[in-house]
Amino acid sequence: MRQSTYLAPTMRDVPADAEAISHQLMLRAGMMRQIAAGVYAYLPLAKRTIAKIEAIIREELDAIGAQELTLPSLHPAELWQASGRWEAMGDELVRLKDRHNRDFALGPTHEEVITSLIKDGIASYKKLPLCVYQVQTKFRDERRPRFGLLRGREFIMKDAYSFHDSPESLDEAYWQMHGAYSRIFTRVGLEFRPVIADSGAMGGKDTHEFMALASVGEDTVVYSDGSDYAANLEMAKAALPEAPSVQAHGLLEKRATPEAKTVDEAAEALGFDADDIFKALVVVVDDVLSLFILRGNDELNEVKALHELGAKTLRMASEEEVVAAFGATPGSIGPVGVKDVPIYADYRIRSMERIACGANETGYHYVNVGPGRDYEVTAYKDLRTVREGDPSPDGKGTLRFAEGIEIGQIFKLGTRYSESLDAKYLDGQGKAQPFLMGCYGIGVSRTLAAVIEQHHDEAGIVWPKAVAPFDVHLLALNVKNEDQKTLAEQLYSDIRQAGIDVLYDDRPERAGVKFKDADLIGLPVRVAVGKRAGEGIIEVKVRKTGEQLELTASELVRWLNDFLRE
């Protein structure tokens, strides 16, 4: 491809509103342009890389027996109303009406549509298992689009769906897809971790997110430095502490703490360490007022709490609800003497030997609090957000934190959608059964951005070979020089005939401009035809390592083939 006629308008300055490196470099390298907030046009360089990412995805999914199809982007509201997500998705669902005043949505995902399709197309267990996938543009009305392709209103996604007649079949497909995802992200050149995750609005039970490690990541990855344990912060666990063998608490004593409204203020007033004071939180769990107690330095993890309690909803009680139930304001709440409210304690409470807590009287705290003697726990649960340095739950190593970009997620949906849309098949006994389902997503445009986040330097992008828009950037440094132009044209022809993708910079620009643009675009190899063209000598530079060498024109194609096969 000749750069003189190629749509790749490079920019020298960093756009003021571009925060993420991938956003900055894609704009500067002429890969995309913004049309509206969170909406982008992909220019030819980006399209070529996206095509390579999609090709890798197709190869790996086809290899495990998945079949490609295309589903509509326009979804009738009735399907989403049947699943309950028409309301649950809230403002993020892009809604519209047709000329007949019928409600539709632009699909952010396709569980409802594919379930409806399979409901009408598969009648017998003999057709199962089945796995289908598509690569398509999705839509989500983000409140605050940012970071370019990492959080947009329109994005490219691969979504796959599997249908099964047994938990064992679903489990096999889930782990097959887990392996395929690992191969896909390895092939595109990403450093990533599969992490235990929360299914959120998707429903279902088991799920893993695939997180690309990057400083711009909006999610926190928690991993063990001594094993392969990894989870997102919402779901991460730490090893549970053991209760001390002897607990001597002394006589329960009430002390005045009139200025203490927080754990830290209570600690200062009582002369205690904050971690020796109960953090008591009044929480409404599925409409039941409950009391959660954690150590003072810990934070409640609401997602984990929902899972631990098997609850559907959880919210913090209002101050009015707290006062009505406990007779005190929130800073003075504790479990002592509480009888009619369920008390859920974090496991770390069990290791406390010196305990203080609110006395359920505004401006007072108890010290020398003894479990069993002064209060009873309904159940111990894992309620806290883990901290870096906690022991790993598998007993191997300690927990470390890293920032990550979610690039994929896989789910075991179970019968969440098949039951709500009444999608059933006949089993071996002729009895109607709801399909067991799995769903599996990859953010294709996010993957593109994640690759750039991990592969760049001060000069620009540094493409991994597998997804580079072109393999080679050929530069004619002075197109007015006959020797240079003639040799560059010959090399352009030779490289193309060898089946190697080449971008040929034949523009009438200065050599310095061409070098800067080549570094910015970041193709794996730069071939410069310069002053020694009359001798048949060219300069080759490897973008990743900076290695430079001189070759004769006759050696180039063989060297390129060897390099690209490495």
From Swiss-Prot:
Annotated EC: 6.1.1.15
Domain notes: Consists of three domains: the N-terminal catalytic domain, the editing domain and the C-terminal anticodon-binding domain.
Assembly description: Homodimer.
PROSITE patterns assigned to the protein according to its UniProt record, in alphabetical order: AA_TRNA_LIGASE_II
Enzyme class: ligase
Subcellular location field: Cytoplasm
Catalytic activity of the protein: tRNA(Pro) + L-proline + ATP = L-prolyl-tRNA(Pro) + AMP + diphosphate
One of the GO BP terms on file: prolyl-tRNA aminoacylation
NCBIfam families noted in UniProt: PRK09194.1, proS_fam_II
Designated gene of the protein: proS
GO CC annotation terms, alphabetical: cytosol
Known function: Catalyzes the attachment of proline to tRNA(Pro) in a two-step reaction: proline is first activated by ATP to form Pro-AMP and then transferred to the acceptor end of tRNA(Pro). As ProRS can inadvertently accommodate and process non-cognate amino acids such as alanine and cysteine, to avoid such errors it has two additional distinct editing activities against alanine. One activity is designated as 'pretransfer' editing and involves the tRNA(Pro)-independent hydrolysis of activated Ala-AMP.
Source organism per UniProt: Shouchella clausii (strain KSM-K16)
Family: Belongs to the class-II aminoacyl-tRNA synthetase family. ProS type 1 subfamily.
Superkingdom of this protein's organism: Bacteria
Keywords for the protein's UniProt record, in alphabetical order: Aminoacyl-tRNA synthetase, ATP-binding, Cytoplasm, Ligase, Nucleotide-binding, Protein biosynthesis
GO molecular function: aminoacyl-tRNA deacylase activity; ATP binding; catalytic activity, acting on a protein; proline-tRNA ligase activity; transferase activity
Protein's UniProt keywords contain Nucleotide-binding: yes
Protein name: Proline--tRNA ligase
One Pfam family it belongs to: tRNA-synt_2b
